């Protein structure tokens, strides 16, 4: 019977990780920001800030307001909000488009029978995160052809298809940002905004850098 190799001093000194205690194998994350892989690894400064935040209690609404200012300054956006992940961000963005500043509508969600509740979306953009949009009470309306998705052609979404789908029940347009779709974004925004329709851009993996 072979003798077990002696442990080195380094191996003995290295503490067991939380994942080892739970029996969860670690992965090599080559995707970066994907929530389902745990998101990005935290920088030491972030870990320190999280540890400091855990030592006190604050009013979360006040914290969100302060965080919004920091996010806006870092990204160039008008405002920002901290969420638990990409799906939560889509749900909150959809809820904002459904309710706006109407407190009664906010209280009614996800019951959207008395308000515009349809979210337009290119058929080629449909994906598993659609559930996050419907969670807020929205109904997704497919528009356009699925030529690219089926490999039957190269035709993409056109402005007239968006205009034909907009009616009094429309609340927003959802655009999924990928290297293959970004070229259509200016047209989508111009067409939707012309009809007073906000555009939700799912760009969960586009930041950083700030230029995006």
Identify the residue ranges that each predicted region occupies:
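N-terminal export signals
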Residues: 1-11
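A glycine-/small-polar-enriched, mobile loop at the entrance of the PLP active site in fold-type I
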Residues: 28-66
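Conserved PLP-enzyme active-site core in the AAT-like
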Residues: 14-37, 41, 68-82, 87-212
């Amino acid at each position: 019977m072979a003798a077990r190799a002696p442990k080195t001093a380094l191996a003995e000194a290295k503490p067991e990780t939380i994942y080892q205690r739970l029996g969860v194998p670690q992965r090599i994350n080559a995707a970066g920001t994907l929530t389902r892989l745990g998101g990005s690894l935290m920088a030491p400064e972030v870990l320190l800030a999280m540890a400091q935040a855990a030592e006190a209690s604050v009013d979360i609404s006040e914290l969100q307001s302060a965080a919004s200012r920091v996010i806006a300054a870092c990204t160039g956006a008008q405002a920002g909000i901290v969420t638990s992940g990409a799906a939560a961000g889509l749900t909150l963005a959809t809820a904002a488009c459904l309710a706006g500043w109407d407190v009664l509508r906010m209280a009614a969600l996800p019951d959207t029978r008395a308000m515009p509740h349809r979210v337009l979306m290119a058929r080629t953009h449909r994906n598993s995160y659609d559930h996050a949009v419907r969670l807020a009470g929205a109904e997704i309306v497919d528009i356009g052809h699925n030529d690219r998705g089926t490999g039957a052609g190269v035709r993409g979404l056109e402005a007239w298809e968006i205009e034909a789908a907009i009616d009094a029940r429309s609340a927003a347009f959802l655009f999924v940002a990928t290297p293959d779709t970004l070229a259509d974004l200016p047209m989508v925004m111009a067409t939707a905004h012309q009809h007073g329709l906000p555009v939700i851009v799912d760009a969960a993996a586009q930041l950083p850098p700030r230029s995006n």
